């Protein structure tokens, strides 16, 4: 069980890798959203033993390059509603402290605590296929 918390910003992100009970496998570090940096993170994750889940907040469009990269690589990626993360952080943090590093730790910790409730991101092609099936079911049920 390995949770990768990514605090996404414009052009860069802060990444923290945690195991259960708050064990930090990789201290928070910054990375750019370039292909070289994403491949380096992918290489790091491939060296880890255990099931990996990548967790990030939805941030308008800024999270999309990271989301797409890791989804296409076959990772379990979960995109969290910012309001849910804000509530979680409020309920679980020491008041006043807010930095990108602390946010990445908080997001990774959210991934550990909500491990079995995390929803895996489905790519657009999967969503459109499901909508197509739903549309067919609706037509079949009305005829």
Please give the residue ranges for each predicted region.
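Phosphate- and other anionic-substrate recognition elements at nucleic-acid/protein interfaces
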Residues: 1-143
């Amino acid at each position: 069980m390995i949770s990768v918390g990514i605090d996404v910003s414009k052009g860069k992100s802060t990444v923290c890798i945690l195991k259960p009970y708050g064990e930090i496998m990789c201290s928070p570090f910054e990375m750019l959203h370039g292909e070289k940096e994403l491949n380096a993170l992918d290489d790091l994750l491939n060296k880890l033993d255990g099931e990996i889940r990548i967790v990030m907040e939805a941030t308008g469009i800024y999270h999309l390059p990271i989301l797409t990269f890791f989804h296409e690589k076959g990772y379990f990626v979960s995109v969290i509603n910012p309001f849910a993360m804000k509530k979680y952080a409020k309920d679980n943090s020491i008041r006043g402290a807010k930095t990108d590093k602390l946010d990445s730790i908080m997001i990774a910790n959210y991934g550990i605590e909500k491990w079995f409730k995390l929803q895996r991101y489905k790519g657009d092609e999967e969503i459109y296929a499901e909508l197509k099936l739903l549309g067919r079911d609706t037509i079949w049920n009305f005829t």
